[in-house]
Amino acid sequence: MRKLFLDAFGEKKLDKPPVWIMRQAGRYLPEYRAVRVKFDNFMDMCRNADACCEVALHPLQRYDLDAAIVFSDILTIPEAMGMDLKFIKGAGPVFSEPIQSQKDLDKLKSIEDSIGSLDYVYNAVKTTSSAINVPLIGFTGSPWTLAAYMIEGSGSKQFNKLRKMMYANPQLMHSLLQRLADITIIYLLEQVKAGASSVMIFDTWGGILPLEHYKNFSLKYMEYIAKNVKQKINIPIVFFTKGGSNFFEEIKDKSCDGVGVDWSVTLKQARHRIGVGKVLQGNFDPAFLYGSKQSIRETVRANIEFIQSDKLNNYIVNLGHGIYPDIDPDSVRVMIDAIREFSA
């Protein structure tokens, strides 16, 4: 197995950084779209281990990447808890009966029953890990991010229902977050048991919170998960809060091994605020892949020059969020080739 990705979490400074891409198995690839049309809905595809493996392999077959990520979705846990999940074209994920009260929370399945409904994810991890020669990344959504969808019923610009519950009924909010955190610990451990070499916690909506609320309603539960996972098995864990650059000083002392960085700050700024000891992952703006070949190469060169100049810390080159569906696959090749060239 190529271990450059895992070596980034070690103490030795690497000669070159590993690279992978968030949502690297996705709609921008025509081969992904060819598999997707075979399934009536997205979750049916996620429940098919062979399909998950096939689409996870697509980017590895196209590009020189140092890691794969299991093909799944962050909302597998709420669905396993008994919530009715549908992916609606133009609207994204939708829960028909969102959480609004303690009564709604009481209707959810127990942790034991919920975990038993997630075997299809572990099967996808096992099938994929046995088919690749690079580390496989397992993942989950943060409790706060899962709660955001469970309470709103869908994505949102303002998340008014979510924030209302946080302020008006914090006890109910914490009850939901704690249950999600307890399930997530088992969920991640099962992914590792099935073959994941590291895990990532996607805190997609943590960035909407004020600092104190981020600490109490998001980071607290990610740290709880990381500590409990590491008590069982010491694997690399990466926290990624989208829009979370204001929170780096709070994250730097937590149990994660790496921190995802979006494009709102430079890697130099992020390193200054996080300090030494944590791997930084990121942080290209996904939209930079719309640019010309020359502009892509120039942007890559600037980031790689900083990475190479830091003699103490390792970095994982990635985008600052998931790749957009309409990106030209050839632009991705330009990016990766430039990363390899300028890292040589």
Curated annotation (Swiss-Prot):
Positions that bind substrate: 23-27, 73, 149, 204, 321
Keyword match Cytoplasm: yes
GO cellular component, one term: cytosol
Keywords from the UniProt entry: Cytoplasm, Decarboxylase, Lyase, Porphyrin biosynthesis
Enzyme Commission no: 4.1.1.37
Record field: catalytic activity: uroporphyrinogen III + 4 H(+) = coproporphyrinogen III + 4 CO2
UniProt keyword annotation of Cytoplasm present: yes
EC category name: lyase
GO biological process per UniProt: protoporphyrinogen IX biosynthetic process
Major place of residence: cytoplasm
Domain of life assignment: Bacteria
Residues with site note (Transition state stabilizer): 73
InterPro entries: UROD/MetE-like_sf, Uroporphyrinogen_deCO2ase_HemE, Uroporphyrinogen_deCOase
Associated pathway: Porphyrin-containing compound metabolism; protoporphyrin-IX biosynthesis; coproporphyrinogen-III from 5-aminolevulinate: step 4/4
Locations listed in the record: Cytoplasm
Gene Ontology terms, MF aspect: uroporphyrinogen decarboxylase activity
Protein function: Catalyzes the decarboxylation of four acetate groups of uroporphyrinogen-III to yield coproporphyrinogen-III.
Similarity comment text for this entry: Belongs to the uroporphyrinogen decarboxylase family.
Subunit structure and binding partners: Homodimer.
HAMAP family: URO_D
Descriptive protein name: Uroporphyrinogen decarboxylase
Organism: Francisella tularensis subsp. holarctica (strain LVS)
Gene name in the database record: hemE
